[in-house]
Curated annotation (Swiss-Prot):
The keyword tRNA-binding applies. The gene is rplA. It comes from the Bacteria. One of its GO terms (cellular component) is large ribosomal subunit. Binds directly to 23S rRNA. The L1 stalk is quite mobile in the ribosome, and is involved in E site tRNA release. This is Large ribosomal subunit protein uL1.
């Protein structure tokens, strides 16, 4: 794959044979950021599990102490008092049948997080084929099917991120923007890694974290020592 001159210059700063400690890696990620926009800093964690087995799934949510730096649009499926609570907590879209119809008929998914009260799931279940592939389907495990809609909305707005394995046993997760600086990114990084370690399934054997890479949107990957992930 051909990369531009700026990328190649940035890549020269990274020792591909070295496993960096987290602080060094984040510092280097900031140094290798060259885009004109405020790049996102992402972490990619490869785990020693087989995602084909139900007992080796890894997923969860964590509130990053410094947020993600992006504005989060929240949709809530709720009625009555719960709809009012969601609106007061700052949800961008609140409703029931009319929102389901909009999503079904128009394929509308102009939101980042979808929350539902348990009684709405019969209705929301119809949207599985549209919301599922985009990772937007409300789920009790990720705290997005709940009676406490106000808390869920506030957490989503504050920088709660959901992490889950992809088919190749890797978790991809943003930890903030380049403009956050090293300390805030490091704090978010450690919070995420601690949450992933806590979510280790009982069926996982041996060394749980196989590799960790940190990179900005346009920058090269920087490897962190998986034996000293924090």
């Amino acid at each position: 794959m051909f990369r531009g001159k700026k990328y190649q210059e940035a890549a020269k700063l990274v020792d591909k044979t070295k496993l960096y400690d987290p602080e060094e890696a984040i510092e280097l990620a900031l140094k290798t950021s060259y885009a004109k926009f405020d790049e996102t800093v992402e972490v990619h964690v490869r785990l020693n599990v087989d995602p084909r087995h139900a007992d080796q799934q890894v997923r969860g949510t964590v509130v990053l102490p410094n947020g993600t730096g992006k504005s989060v649009r929240v949709l809530v499926f709720a009625k009555g008092d719960k709809a009012k609570e969601a609106e007061e907590a700052g949800a961008d879209y609140v409703g029931a049948e009319e929102l389901v119809a909009k999503i079904q008929n128009e394929g509308w998914t102009d939101f980042d997080v979808c929350i539902a009260t348990p009684d709405m799931m019969g209705l929301v279940g119809r949207l599985g084929k549209i919301l599922g592939p985009k990772g937007l389907m409300p789920n009790p495990k990720s705290g997005t099917v709940t009676m406490d809609v106000a808390k869920a909305v506030k957490e989503a707005k504050a920088g709660r991120v959901e992490f889950r394995l992809d088919k190749t046993a890797i978790i991809h997760c943003p930890i903030g923007k380049v403009s956050f600086g090293k300390e805030k990114l490091l704090e978010n990084y450690r919070t995420l890694i601690e949450a992933i370690i806590k979510a280790r399934p009982a069926a996982a054997k041996g060394q749980f974290i196989k590799s960790i890479t940190v990179a900005t949107t346009m920058g090269p990957g920087i490897k962190i020592n998986p034996l000293k992930p924090l």
